[in-house]
Amino acid sequence: QLRRGGRSVDLDWLLDLGGGVSWSDLQRLLIDSQGRIAIDQSLEELEKLWLLHLEQSMPLQHLVGVCPWRDLLLEVSSAALIPRQETELLVDLALAFAGGRPPRSWADLGTGCGAIAVSLCRAWPEAEGHAVDLSADALALAKKNLKALAPQQSCRLHHGSWWLPLQAFWGQLEIVVSNPPYIPSPLLGELDPVVREHEPHVALVGGEDGLEAIRSLLIDAPHALAPGGVLFLEHHHDQSESVQDLMRAAGLVNVSAANDLEGIARFAQGQRALSSVL
């Protein structure tokens, strides 16, 4: 099939998630080409999925309906962004900040498929969680993932923009995490077709400079966070200084950056002052 195009790592991924063929199964076939392995779908069906990926730039995750992320296998669709590996670090940052003392209340703003919310629910089963999204379809997807992967944990779903649906909880949110849209609109055309043509632009594009959503989100952050509460944001690879400046201008303190897996500053955090008067 690789003669038709595509990357071997993507074909291996499809065989694994779509066909139930593990990496070790593939290695055994390389050693013994006459060997047999069981597959969950017919080769014809897998070939159809591969051609859709090659010819229509369909994301493999959409074709099989799932995406592995951290220790989870999440249901995904075109209703929300496919969770990226680097976003796993947002969860790591939140967990490290909490240490051995889970927050009483946390929130995931722009939850999408619910990847972050599910992870935080599983890490902090006794905490009160909130997941917010502007898209009703994304919230429906998040609800499915929360029900399947964190059925015993408490997480309320809220439909609306950023902090607004959480006004009843302002001043109580101790840890808040968000992966907002941050791609500058002039760069949209440069994105890979698999992203540009099949993932929701409302969750990708952050205006002309990519900071529109982040500015909006920061307006109410000092009011909505609990005293000493922290906000973690993911941003574009070249926005670190700008996002930190915006956090300070909004009144947050202890502002700092954190790097992604490649050593690039892709995350920012800031706190509401313990004794802030707003």
Specify the residue positions occupied by each region the protein language model found.
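Conserved SAM/SAH cofactor-binding pocket of Class I
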Residues: 89-190
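Conserved AdoMet
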Residues: 15-96
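Flexible, glycine-/basic-rich loop-and-beta segments that form/coincide
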Residues: 274-278
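Mobile active-site "lid"/loop adjacent to the S-adenosyl-L-methionine
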Residues: 182-213
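Non-catalytic nucleic-acid substrate-recognition regions in nucleic-acid-modifying enzymes
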Residues: 1-10
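Residue-level signal for inorganic ion chemistry
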Residues: 14, 57, 87, 116, ...
